[in-house]
């Protein structure tokens, strides 16, 4: 009996690997095209770090005319959560990052290199495991959990490196006949890789991001096929990325130490290894120290958080590119109106150390992104968000014609309004334009410099009775406020007041503030002329009257 007989005994009904090599031929892509993948496990919510990896992988593929695909690594089925795959697929859709190939729903996929769900590729992995066994490069291991625990305890007592290797690999040196006998006797087993490595030898590896890295060779006889017949991550990665013709594996740097093993697997399987690019994690400032964004501690670690907050997907992607390449910020300053797809992203320019997450910076980008949208776009995005997360806002936006006027205030100017950073800001920033919201929440009027109640009442009275005309253009409108200011003993120009502060009670800007506060209960709003044009004469008259009543 030889290795081939043993392989046939273990996997009698699987196809020869030549079948799969023919089924998944080289991709017909232009020279230099990069093939990348996002390969998450459906074991919980999608982490912002996962989205970061996916964005980088997709950007690199798109830039080179390559392919970006989604593969679901669901071989650890005990940890799989309900709707885990759906959550992954929807997260990519939400950020306009749908893959060129792979899973497009929990059960549907597109592309010619599937299945793209590892649990459906069991026979493929077994075919390649059979090949390794037939070559004497893998073997069945019959060690029980108790025996493995005993090995670990002995290693700990002797203070030597733990693991299944060398003299500790009890089943490595079983003869073919001994292994066959145990299998025929019904002893349970798994399949281990027979590592040709030695820990006292070094390998040199050039990571696309980290640069040159030295590692000890892998000498562990790792499990490649588990008792349930499914592969481990390491083995599935090698087989899948070979058959799917991945050219660049872009993943978290927590996998950097696995490179020696993965390169060894590729070599022993006779595959060409892909290039590896290990991304540093996104960090958080925690009391002066740096730590990884935590699923447990940080709500912003979950991709779902950004959707609930209503932070535009374009802003999140722009922010992630900002921390991915240090050249992005200068590019954006030079090209304020270009799509992020036009940025010349460089994988090898990514930071070797983890970037600090900056929510203030992200929200600032959100303001810029929203400021460039049309009123119609802002309305549509706000309504989509509100229907899922804010019933009151959704009801408010039912009058589309009025809402478009509200969102049109200071939009389309050379310097458009930048008060909305996320869709959850919308209610706060436009609520005062709606009577139900305004009267339901106004409880004080912060008038600022002019605080004398008689003066305030007179300003409001004179304005509506003598000066306001809804057909006035902006210059005429402001000239009339100046006239009102002068009539009331205030400076008609700010510079007049600054030159002779003793001659005036205040200036035209302070009079404008009285009107602003009376109409909006805010001291800071977008352009008052535009606000008043949208509110209209009847609303304005009523609000000024209510403000006067509030003075009593």
Regions found by a protein language model. Name each.
Residues 57, 88, 132, 136, ...:
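Residue-level signal for inorganic ion chemistry
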């Amino acid at each position: 009996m030889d290795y081939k007989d043993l392989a046939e005994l273990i996997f009698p009904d699987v196809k020869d690997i030549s079948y799969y090599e023919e089924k998944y031929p080289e991709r017909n892509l232009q020279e230099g095209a990069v093939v990348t993948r996002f390969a998450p496990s459906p074991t919980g919510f999608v982490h912002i770090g996962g989205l970061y990896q996916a964005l980088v992988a997709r950007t690199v593929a798109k830039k080179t005319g390559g392919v970006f695909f989604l593969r679901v690594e669901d071989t650890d089925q005990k940890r799989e959560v309900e709707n885990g795959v759906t959550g992954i697929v929807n997260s990519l859709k939400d950020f306009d990052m749908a893959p060129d190939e792979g899973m497009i729903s929990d059960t549907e996929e597109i592309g010619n290199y599937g299945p793209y769900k590892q649990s459906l590729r069991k026979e493929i992995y077994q075919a390649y495991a059979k090949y390794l066994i037939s070559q004497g490069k893998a073997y069945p291991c019959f060690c029980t959990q108790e025996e493995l625990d005993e090995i670990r305890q002995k290693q700990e007592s002797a203070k030597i490196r733990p693991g299944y290797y060398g003299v500790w690999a009890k089943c490595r040196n079983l003869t073919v006949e001994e292994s066959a006998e145990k299998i025929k006797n019904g002893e349970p087993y798994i399949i281990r890789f027979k590592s040709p490595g030695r820990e006292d030898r070094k390998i040199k590896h050039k990571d696309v991001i980290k640069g040159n890295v030295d590692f000890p060779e892998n000498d562990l006889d790792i499990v490649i096929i588990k008792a349930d017949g499914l592969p481990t991550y390491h083995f599935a990665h090698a087989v899948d990325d070979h058959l799917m013709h991945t050219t660049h594996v872009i993943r978290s740097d927590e996998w950097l130490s696995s490179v020696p093993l993965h390169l060894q697997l590729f070599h022993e399987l006779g595959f060409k290894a892909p290039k590896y690019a290990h991304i540093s994690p996104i960090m958080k400032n925690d009391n002066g120290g740096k730590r990884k964004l935590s699923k447990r501690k940080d709500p912003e670690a979950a991709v779902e958080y950004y959707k609930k907050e209503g932070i535009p997907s374009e802003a999140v992607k722009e922010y992630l590119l900002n921390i991915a390449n240090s050249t992005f910020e200068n590019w954006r300053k030079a090209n304020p109106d270009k799509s992020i797809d036009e940025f010349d992203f460089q994988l090898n320019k990514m930071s070797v150390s983890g970037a600090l997450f900056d929510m203030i910076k992200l929200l600032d980008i959100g303001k810029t992104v929203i400021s460039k949208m049309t009123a119609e776009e802002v309305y549509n995005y706000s309504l989509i968000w509100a229907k899922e997360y804010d019933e009151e806002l959704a009801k408010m936006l039912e009058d589309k014609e009025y809402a478009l006027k509200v969102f049109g205030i200071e939009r389309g100017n050379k310097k458009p309004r930048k008060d909305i950073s996320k869709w959850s800001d919308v209610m706060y920033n436009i609520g005062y334009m709606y009577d139900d919201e305004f009267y339901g929440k106004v409880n004080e009027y912060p008038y600022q410099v002019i605080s004398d109640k008689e003066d305030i009442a007179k300003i409001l009275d004179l304005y509506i009775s003598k000066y306001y005309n809804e057909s006035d253009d902006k210059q005429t409108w402001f000239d009339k406020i100046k006239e009102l200011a002068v009539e009331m003993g205030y400076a008609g120009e700010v510079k007049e007041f600054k030159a002779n502060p003793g001659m005036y009670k205040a200036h035209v800007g302070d009079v404008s503030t009285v009107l602003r506060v009376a109409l909006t209960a805010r001291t800071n709003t977008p352009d008052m002329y535009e606000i008043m044009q949208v509110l209209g004469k009847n609303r304005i008259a009523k609000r000024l009257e209510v403000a006067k009543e509030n003075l009593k």
